């Protein structure tokens, strides 16, 4: 798909300012340059960044409200969805403190570079979230292409506290993952079909208890 068409598609679903588009273009350029040596995203998606990565990441922004003060991206990787959300928040003047947690030092270096270049209100932490001894808290948590659902649920149940909602991006196997997880967990959630694929979903969890 032509880049101009991708940007138009992005703007049709996520209405943003010209300044936001400019910032996302800068992010895109930094990503393409760094990807040559760091393998941040698959080569098959390098020409689909605006739809495959930016739009897919941005689709949860309208479900974050003014009462949410913080958002934590677990296993941020190349910055999806955390950096995309941070760029939109900056230009919408949303006072949301965003935290990116990533265990790879190389990816952390890239994330910090983007944050500095775009002057984003983002904290980047080089940590393996599974090895952090203390519990962590925050209003909103997001994960995309991180770990299987059952592992994410166990992580959140054992280590997260005082959270309001968790957004989890699920692919083609998501329906079966939810079915299997519901055998062990009492999950209160809303499910939305992804705007980028009818075979994918985004779930918003607001309650999580062990059965």
Regions found by a protein language model. Name each.
Residues 58-139, 143:
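Conserved SAM/SAH cofactor-binding pocket of Class I
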Residues 103, 169-173:
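Short strand-turn motif at the edge of the Rossmann-like AdoMet-binding core
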Residues 141-143, 165-168:
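Short catalytic-loop micro-motif centered on adjacent basic/acidic residues
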Residues 112, 153-156, 179-181:
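Short amphipathic alpha-helical segments
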Residues 97, 121-123, 165, 186-189:
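Conserved beta-strand segments of alpha/beta enzyme cores
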Residues 2-67, 72, 106-109, 113-120:
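Class I SAM-dependent transferase core
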Residues 99, 173-211:
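Active-site capping/gating segments
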Residues 153-166:
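A short glycine-rich, Lys/Arg-flanked "PGG" loop and its adjoining helix->strand segment in the class I
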């Amino acid at each position: 798909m032509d880049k101009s068409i991708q940007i138009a598609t992005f703007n049709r679903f996520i209405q943003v300012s010209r300044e936001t588009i400019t910032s996302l273009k800068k992010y895109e350029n930094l990503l393409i340059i760094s990807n040559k040596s760091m393998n941040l995203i698959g080569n098959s998606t390098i020409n689909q960044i605006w739809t495959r990565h930016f739009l897919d990441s941005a689709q949860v922004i309208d479900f974050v409200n003014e009462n949410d003060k913080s958002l934590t991206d677990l296993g941020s990787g190349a910055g999806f969805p955390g950096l995309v959300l941070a760029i939109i928040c900056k230009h919408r003047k949303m006072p949301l403190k965003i935290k990116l947690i990533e265990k790879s030092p190389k990816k952390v270096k890239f994330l910090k570079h983007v944050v500095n270049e775009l002057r984003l209100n983002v904290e980047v932490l080089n940590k393996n979230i599974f090895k952090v001894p203390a519990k962590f808290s925050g209003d909103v948590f997001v994960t995309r292409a991180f770990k299987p659902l059952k592992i994410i649920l166990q992580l959140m149940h054992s280590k997260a506290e005082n959270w309001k909602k968790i957004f989890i991006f699920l692919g083609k196997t998501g329906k079966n993952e939810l079915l299997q997880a519901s055998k062990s967990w009492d999950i209160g959630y809303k499910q939305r079909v992804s705007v980028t694929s009818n075979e994918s979903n985004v779930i918003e969890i607001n309650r999580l208890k062990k059965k």
